[in-house]
Amino acid sequence: MASASGESLEKLEDMIVRAAESTAAHVRAAKAAISSVIFGQDIVVERALVTVLSGGHALLVGVPGLAKTKLVETMGIALGLDAKRVQFTPDLMPSDILGTEVLEETPGGKRSFRFIAGPVFAQLLMADEINRASPRTQSALLQAMQEQHVTVAGARHDLPKPFHVLATQNPLEQEGTYPLPEAQLDRFLMEVDVDYPDLEAERKILFDTTGADETRAKAAMTADDLIAAQRLVRRLPVGESVVEAILALVRSARPGPEAGDIGKLISWGPGPRASQALMLAVRARALLEGRFAPSVDDVLELAEPVLKHRMALTFAARAEGKTIPNVIGRLKARIG
């Protein structure tokens, strides 16, 4: 009897391992599919995928023309998600994003309201230049991101699952923009810098995008596959050394005694949501690389994109030329 139960336990463990390996293979295939179209942005692709695998949203910061829109479109294809895009402008209203109710009349003369869903009812939404919309419109989207549903005319409408937002900002043009408040920035799991491609990547871009046949991504996953991967991420074991590294890093990024001499440079720092985000992100990165447990290296790699939009420097620190990436680098050096 004992041996029979032992065999069934081994079979169950084998099934779990096989399912995990299959999920990891799907995730790696999706990354390869995206990278076959988006050249020279490997770190951006990785961090965008880590965000989605963690069940979160990302803020992409970069100048125009760096394939941010193409990244979202390609991710939608590779992950098998329904992707939509909204161009944010100062005159954009909350109803333009969430949807609205219209009065309809039947042939019999009966009138009733019908809800017309807005573009937020997508599995992957690109909020292009989110800081160009009014604070009221920004809040409507960010509330939907947090609550996973919208309320119009007193009626609740659940958003599809999975639901992820990749918002973009242009770091150069500040005229006519409405910067996101700190509390709303905290809704984004990561802030990802999109930089210029290197020489070889740009050469490849020239040949691939100006010829007769442009490379197109192929679907590597479905929405159900992604949901399974997100569940697996939450079940991956995390070693005590990784937990301690996360706690030490996040707590030292706040003004106070735990920051030591760096504390006087910090005006305000990340809350517990940053620790939660980092805990999920390191698991997702491990899965993306075919590992079933994260390491301290994952913490160090993802510290900056998870923390930098969740903290601010004092006026004196900024006057001395200090930057948030510089401060995070010093905090990482204490751990690594």
What are these regions (language model features)?
Residues 2-21, 28, 256-336:
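C-terminal engagement/docking regions of AAA+ P-loop ATPases
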Residues 19-63:
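Pre-Walker A (pre-P-loop) alpha-helix and adjacent loop at the N terminus of AAA/AAA+ ATPase modules
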Residues 128-129, 140:
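Walker B catalytic acidic pair
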Residues 63, 97, 168:
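P-loop (Walker A) phosphate-binding loop of NTP-binding proteins
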